Regions:
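Active-site beta->alpha N-cap acidic-glycine motif
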Residues: 115
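Feature activates predominantly on carbohydrate-active enzymes
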Residues: 1-111, 119, 123, 133, ...
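Short, surface-exposed, polar/charged, turn-prone segments marking secondary-structure boundaries
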Residues: 105-107, 156-162, 218-219
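Substrate-binding cleft/loops of secretory-pathway carbohydrate-active enzymes
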Residues: 130-158, 203-211
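Glycoside hydrolase catalytic-domain groove-lining segments
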Residues: 140-148, 154-198
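Short, acidic/polar
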Residues: 59, 176-180, 208-218
């Protein structure tokens, strides 16, 4: 679905579900996908593989050719990891992650590269690129910096919602606040994906009303 000002296509978990799909490439090119625990798995991409970058750039450009609206205030392309922990551990990805102290090292480098090439291919000044700081990519990298047209969507899934995020006595939330501060130092487009209900048990009571106001004020 296309919104005039908003996301082009899906807004989450787009890598392998929308871009470089394994049902097209995995059998013939397993090297396009994550090397995890000694084998290639189709649940995530190998983000340092140059062919993967080429494919994703081409697929993004194809979507933009069809759906780009130059009159929109902003349109967002989501380049976001799938919902699992099967990140790539190949030599190149590991070296980049190690150099950045975070698996976000490969993700931000990948998104920066795709964004640069897409912008060079056409007049897409109102297009920005969105990625996650989520689970294994939640910690900010120490070397690579997101481009000005890259959004980092920081997810609070590991947080405690019985306390405010800035409660100094809550270890889970102290870790999140540290990550929020570190991302804020290197990125001017930090968005928040906050968890204001229990997605696993939607009908269960989720007593977070007392912390919601303060958490929004923090953001």
């Amino acid at each position: 679905m296309l919104f005039r000002s908003g996301y082009i296509g899906s807004f989450a978990h787009t890598l392998v579900t929308h871009y470089c799909k394994p049902d097209i490439y995995f059998e013939s090119h397993p090297e396009y996908y994550a090397y995890h625990k000694g084998e290639r798995v189709p649940q995530q991409l190998c983000l340092t593989n140059p062919d993967v970058i080429d494919i994703v750039v081409d697929e993004v450009l194809a979507n933009l050719e069809r759906y780009h609206d130059p009159s929109a205030s902003v349109q967002i392309v989501s380049l976001t990891q799938h919902d699992n922990q099967k990140y790539c551990e190949c030599k190149n990805c590991k070296a980049l992650d190690d150099a950045n102290g975070s698996h976000a090292g490969t993700m931000i480098t990948f998104v920066n590269t795709v964004a640069e090439r897409v912008k060079a291919a056409g007049n897409y000044d109102n297009v920005v690129f969105d990625t996650f700081a989520y689970q294994y990519t939640r910690s900010a990298p120490t070397a690579v910096v997101p481009r000005e047209d890259v959004i980092v969507r920081l997810c609070s899934i590991e947080c405690c919602f019985g306390h405010t995020l800035d409660d100094p006595n809550c270890d889970e939330n102290k870790d999140f606040m540290y990550d929020l501060e570190q991302w804020g130092k290197i990125c001017n487009r930090v968005y928040i994906w906050d968890y204001v209900n229990n997605y696993r048990e939607t009908v269960c009571i989720f007593p977070n009303f007392g912390v919601m106001q303060r958490n929004v004020q923090i953001f």
